[in-house]
A protein has these predicted regions:
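Compositionally biased, intrinsically disordered low-complexity segments enriched in polar/Pro/Gly
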Residues: 1-6, 60, 80-82, 138, ...
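Assembly/oligomerization scaffold segments
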Residues: 1-111, 280-283
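Solvent-exposed, acidic/flexible segments
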Residues: 67-69, 82, 86, 127-135, ...
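An acidic/polar, Gly/Ser/Thr-rich interaction patch typically located in mid-to-C-terminal regions
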Residues: 37-67, 202-323
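Acidic/polar residues at beta-strand termini and the immediately following turn/coil
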Residues: 80-82, 190, 212-215
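Residues that flank catalytic or metal-binding motifs in active/ligand-binding sites
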Residues: 89, 194, 276
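Acidic Ser/Thr/Pro-rich low-complexity disordered segments
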Residues: 20-29, 151-154, 159-160, 210, ...
């Protein structure tokens, strides 16, 4: 019997601004029952910062007051005792609040953000000499921002041409970086674990085999066809995520039925890529440490044909709140 999906394992770490660190978790071995925790880690698409929500029940009042204080950071790991286990979220707590449920239960909700250094309370004031490239511009902005922004990877497919005029930048860091992305077709800006990425969605990592998706690897229910590819759910898998270049998965269509789109008059229906190969364009991890939920929802798009457009801020917020 495959034990890769048995024995839940998770760890929630919260670093408070006074230097203390709260750790709550379950290692899948001991019989001790930790506090109830629910999580919703949502990366609905490229282009933007990301919000996640964590709920903790019945913390001591001392820890509640420490975490409610400004400046807490959070890390969340989840997976299985004998299977995949890894970091799902790393970011800042931007809104904590306490609610009472019933007579004796208190729930601490932590609204968290990944990407605050790019979009929140940051600024860049610098001059770029003539002859710089767009890649050099992005790296300079990240390094010279009031709060420096770590850079993970910038696609090599950005326009290599040198700009003939010098320029002065006096703005929030995301403004000139978004302009670079708009000037490069199929390029996306996103933050992951606090690090800046610019990815070209047509790139692929030839050194990595696509992740197989079938009933033996945790597929739950029936994948749903979309305009761009398919959406599907698997048992919680920290391996699946927003990556640079985009992660590829292979759905075994010989053994998996797909719920087809319903035909609408005047609207063409897409054809599912029969190779079963898709790129991961959005991921949502969610679960309940004492409940049944322990899943990963994936948005996949075909390797050929249409690709999703960059998410605007209003559209991103709409996608994030709808899950």
């Amino acid at each position: 019997m495959n034990k890769a999906y048995y024995g839940r394992k998770w760890l929630l770490q919260v670093a408070c601004n006074d230097g203390s660190v709260l750790e709550i978790g379950e290692d899948g071995i001991s019989e001790e029952t930790p506090l109830k925790v629910t999580f919703d880690v949502n990366y609905p698409g490229y282009q933007g910062w990301y919000f996640s929500e964590f709920n903790i029940w019945n913390l001591t009042s001392d820890w509640q007051q420490k975490i409610i204080g400004e400046g807490s950071e959070i890390w969340f790991y989840a997976g299985y005792k004998e299977g995949n286990y890894g970091l799902l979220f790393s970011g800042k707590v931007f809104q904590p609040f306490l609610t009472r449920e019933g007579v004796v239960n208190y729930k601490l909700t932590l609204m968290c953000m990944d990407g605050d250094r790019l979009f929140k309370d940051n600024f860049i004031s610098t001059n770029m000499p003539a002859g710089y490239t767009e890649s050099q511009l992005v790296n300079a902005i990240a390094a010279q921002a009031f709060t420096p922004i770590p850079v993970n990877k910038i696609t090599e497919r950005l326009a290599p041409s040198q700009l003939v005029r010098k320029s002065t930048i006096f703005a929030s860091p995301d403004v000139p970086i978004r302009e670079v992305v708009r000037n490069n077709i199929d390029s996306y800006l996103y933050m992951r674990e606090g690090k800046l990425n610019i990815v070209d969605v047509n790139e692929s990592d030839s050194s990595q085999e696509p992740l197989g998706i079938n009933s033996k690897t945790g597929l739950v229910g029936t994948p749903q066809q979309t305009d761009f590819g398919i959406n599907f759910r698997v048992l919680l898998n920290p391996v699946i995520g927003i990556t640079n270049p985009p992660m590829e998965v292979k759905v075994d269509l010989s053994k998996v039925n797909i719920a087809m789109q319903r035909a609408v008059l005047g609207r063409p229906v897409s054809v599912v890529d029969q190779t079963g190969w898709f790129k991961v364009g959005g991921v949502r991890h969610f679960g309940d440490s004492r409940g049944n939920e322990w899943y990963t929802d994936v948005t996949g798009y075909a390797l050929s044909g249409k690709t999703p457009a960059n998410l605007t801020v209003p559209l991103y917020l709409q996608r994030a709140s709808s899950n």
